[in-house]
A protein has these predicted regions:
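Conserved adenylation A10 loop of the ANL superfamily
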Residues: 95-109
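Accessory carbohydrate-recognition regions in carbohydrate-active enzymes
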Residues: 36, 55-56, 68, 114-120
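Conserved AMP-binding loop of ANL adenylate-forming enzymes
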Residues: 129-178
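Conserved structural elements of the adenylate-forming
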Residues: 111-133
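Conserved pre-ATP/AMP-binding loop-to-beta segment of ANL
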Residues: 80-97
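Short, solvent-exposed loop/turn and secondary-structure capping segments
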Residues: 109-110, 158-159, 225
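Alpha-helix N-cap/helix-initiation motif
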Residues: 84-88, 109-117, 370, 374
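Active-site glycine/GP-rich loop and adjacent strand/helix microenvironment
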Residues: 1-52, 59-67, 74-82, 161, ...
Length: 505
């Protein structure tokens, strides 16, 4: 009997509970909110916002303000210095480091023991549960899980307190039983130098029977390419013939899909998207034929949503899950067992179903171009690129885009820097196809492009090989959960990238 067949029944039981998501979502979410408020009643935050007087969602929304990291930073700083009962009961020892705000280089997101187990590890368990449900012939546990993570460091030298990539915190605290099927060893998985880690992982894992991969697509690709270099093989399935699934998240998979098809040629390879962030684990692709993910509503996270067009208004009103509409872009607001209260995480989603609640990630609240009223979001960009690639045979590795507000001739346009894995034969044709696709996808963009009166045709600047990796490396962000910002409404990032494009880093 295989190890997978022995373990499978444990995971099957969980999938039965997920059926509540379709019929009892509001009830489940109200229960989550009640538990959150009850647990935090005697914290500093709970006392300041009169949690003892809150008995329903309406009172919660009235008494607790919508917050950003800047507004919670003072509380989090106190927690990082060892104070207890601030945003969540007890002392929080772990902090997930993520990209910063306008005022800070980095954000430090608290990860409580409750959040670690009830949210992050629950998400990993359900991910496997749904995969096994959809693939009854899977031999997932009969080999190794290659889990790619970041690194961590001591937090203010407090005993047993860590700060670093969420993935590193998860690996550090993982159930020892998981180590039986996980690779690489912890000492390698947590190396801080990504290039050394990449090489060590490739050397170790290439000699093992790897059946599944977990990580960010961009960084996993670096490991896979290095594995091919070391082994001399032409495809990953020659190295790991039993490889069957890649659990991926962190960035949109669309730009990488074709590259993975070239790397892993097995027709039996599966890809399963997850929506896990420093702030929590929010969604899973439960149906391999549907790109939308199911919102995970019983992980100790209470969800609210702000219509995207209202997100920058001081009087913006959030709606609970049961108040959302299909097809509308929303900014996510969460309250969690990690002590984040009505917290804007910066991501935007669009619901494709409300029975159960399923969604696609449409972008970031600060990752868009709206310099001329065109309201271009990441979802538009990903779809436009996919269409242009499909028509030209090109493969995009990385990209970023930003506005050119006015050039020497008084013209405004969008400027794209694109690193191609496989370049199109004619870059101008590719640019035209991308521009036309964006006009079909986004009516505001189409209106601004009308006769080029407001917005000229977009410009594409090809990036030299490894440009974006070099840019991340120059900022100390190579590896881990760091990613290239896709769109920006200013030129800060694109100008840095272009400066590096003139040399070899």
């Amino acid at each position: 009997m295989s190890l997978t067949s022995i373990i499978r029944p444990f995971f099957v039981r969980r999938t039965n509970r997920l059926e509540r998501y379709a019929t009892q979502a509001e009830e489940v979410q109200r229960q989550v909110l009640a538990r959150l408020v009850g647990r935090a009643e005697n914290t500093l935050w709970g006392k300041e916002h009169h949690y003892a007087d809150i008995s329903n969602y309406e009172q919660f929304a009235e008494k607790v303000p919508i917050s950003t990291y800047e507004e919670l930073k003072g509380y989090i700083d106190r927690m990082r210095h060892g104070e207890s009962d601030i945003l969540w009961p007890g002392t929080v020892k772990w902090y997930a480091k993520s990209s910063g705000t306008t005022n800070d280089k980095s954000k430090f997101i608290p990860v409580s023991r409750d959040g670690l187990h009830d949210t992050h590890y629950a998400g990993g368990t359900d991910c496997v549960s749904l995969y096994l449900r959809n693939n009854p012939k899977s031999r997932l546990f009969d080999g190794r899980a290659l889990i790619l993570g970041g690194s961590h460091a001591p937090n203010y030298n407090l005993p047993h307190s860590l700060v670093g990539d969420l993935s590193a915190i998860l690996i550090e605290n993982i159930n020892p039983l998981v180590n039986v099927v996980r690779t690489p060893p912890k000492r390698v998985a947590l190396l801080s130098d990504f290039e050394e880690k990449r090489d060590r992982i490739a050397e170790i894992a290439s000699k093992q029977n790897v059946t599944n991969l977990s990580g960010v697509p961009s960084w996993m690709m670096a490991v896979l390419n290095r594995t091919l270099e070391i082994t001399g093989k032409s495809s990953i399935d020659q190295v790991w013939p039993n490889l069957e699934v890649f659990f991926h998240g962190g960035v949109a998979f669309t730009p990488y899909r074709e590259q993975y098809r070239q790397l892993i040629k097995s027709e039996g390879m599966h890809y399963m998207e997850t929506y896990n962030a420093s702030e929590g684990f929010f969604g899973l692709q439960d149906d391999p034929s549907d790109v939308a993910m199911m919102l995970m509503i019983d992980y100790g996270v209470f969800f609210e949503f702000i219509p995207l067009e209202e997100v920058d208004r001081k009087d913006a009103v959030a709606v609970p899950l049961w108040g959302v509409e299909k097809g509308r872009n929303y900014a996510i607001v969460i309250s969690t067992t990690c002590g984040l209260w009505r917290y804007q995480i910066g991501d935007t989603v669009k619901f494709t179903s409300t029975n159960p609640y399923k969604f696609v990630i449409s972008g970031r609240t600060k990752s868009f171009i709206n310099a001329f009223g065109e309201e271009l979001i990441v979802d538009n960009a990903e779809k436009g690129l996919a269409e242009a690639c499909q028509k030209t045979g090109a493969v995009v590795s990385e990209y970023t885009a930003a506005p050119v507000f006015m050039d020497a001739e008084g013209r405004c346009r969008h400027q794209w820097v694109i690193e191609f894995e496989k370049a199109p034969q004619d870059l101008k044709t590719f640019a035209t196809l991308l521009d036309e696709a964006l006009q079909r996808i986004n009516s505001d963009y189409e209106a601004k492009r009308y006769k080029s009166l407001t917005l000229q045709a977009l410009e594409i600047i090809p990036a030299r090989r490894n440009l974006f990796n070099d840019w991340l490396k120059s900022r100390g962000k190579l590896g881990g959960q760091h990613k290239v910002p896709r769109l920006a409404n200013n030129r800060d990032i694109i100008d840095q990238v272009l400066a590096l494009n003139t040399n070899e880093g």
